[in-house]
């Protein structure tokens, strides 16, 4: 339970005495969908890691408020801290994708003593959902027809296709996340960071810019992947596990052998 009374669902895997990796999913996804069904949990536990996967507020089995004020980026970063405190974890490694990467950027800046290194997948600078048309989205869920804006329609269609998603909560999250500090080249965390973005993702150059501005950033281009299918990439998983283990990661996944 968070300080503002929100129940945040967590999932624990592996040996609790091993070093911990925290997994935080993307927009409209869930801990199990983003990480367990895609092989991440299996591979991390197989590498001897203790894994905590989080359903972010508004997602999965966590509470789904319809109040945008519940979803400031600082609040989502604080949820990560609450989970660390609940599990009595002094220091962890972090893996986040898309929304989870943006939250990880903020959490790494706010709590550098708790997050030793982070994998930030599919992260651009700023807020990638600035163009999301809130009123068109609300009209859609009220039965008023599909959004005219293509980006808004794409995200709503994707979210609606995932069981148990609450579209009103997700729209509130988009609105609430517009408040507060966003990732920029001027506010990079100082921990070692692995930036991983699909070669076919439109945000790839913005991800590269964030990496270049990070004191200890490494960039990994996920071959043949876009923003939506990058999390299932075996090359991405292999690069992330290598990075977390302190093994140098090549700039491209072309030479990585899948597991």
Where in the sequence are the language-model features?
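Conserved alpha/beta-hydrolase "nucleophile elbow" surrounding the catalytic nucleophile
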Residues: 25, 92, 96-101
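Active-site loop/oxyanion-hole signature of alpha/beta-hydrolase fold enzymes
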Residues: 36, 42-46, 53-93
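Short beta-strand/loop motif that positions the catalytic acidic residue
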Residues: 189, 195-197
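Short alpha-helix in the alpha/beta-hydrolase fold that links the catalytic acid
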Residues: 204-212
């Amino acid at each position: 339970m968070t300080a503002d009374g929100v129940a945040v669902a967590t999932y624990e895997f592996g040996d609790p005495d091993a070093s911990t990796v925290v997994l935080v999913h993307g927009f409209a996804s869930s801990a199990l969908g983003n990480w367990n069904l895609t092989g991440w949990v299996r591979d991390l536990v197989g590498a001897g890691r203790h894994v905590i996967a989080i359903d972010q507020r508004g997602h999965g089995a966590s509470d789904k408020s319809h109040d945008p004020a519940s979803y400031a980026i600082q609040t989502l970063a604080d949820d990560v801290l609450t989970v660390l405190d609940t599990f009595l974890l002094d220091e962890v490694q972090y893996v986040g994708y898309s929304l989870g990467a943006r939250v990880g950027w903020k959490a790494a800046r706010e709590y550098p003593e708790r997050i030793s290194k982070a994998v930030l997948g599919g992260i651009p600078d700023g807020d990638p959902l600035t163009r999301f048309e809130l009123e068109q989205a609300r009209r859609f869920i009220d039965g008023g027809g599909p959004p005219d804006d293509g980006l808004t329609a794409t995200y709503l269609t994707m979210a609606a296709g995932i069981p148990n998603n609450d579209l009103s909560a997700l729209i509130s999250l988009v609105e609430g996340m517009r408040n507060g500090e966003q990732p920029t080249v001027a506010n990079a965390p100082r921990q070692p960071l692995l930036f991983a973005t699909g070669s076919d993702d439109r945000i790839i150059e913005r991800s590269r810019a964030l990496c270049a501005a990070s004191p200890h950033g490494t960039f990994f281009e996920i071959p043949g992947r876009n923003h939506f299918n990058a999390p299932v990439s075996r090359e991405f998983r292999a690069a992330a596990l290598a990075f977390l283990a302190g093994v140098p990661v090549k700039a491209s996944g072309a030479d990585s052998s899948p597991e």
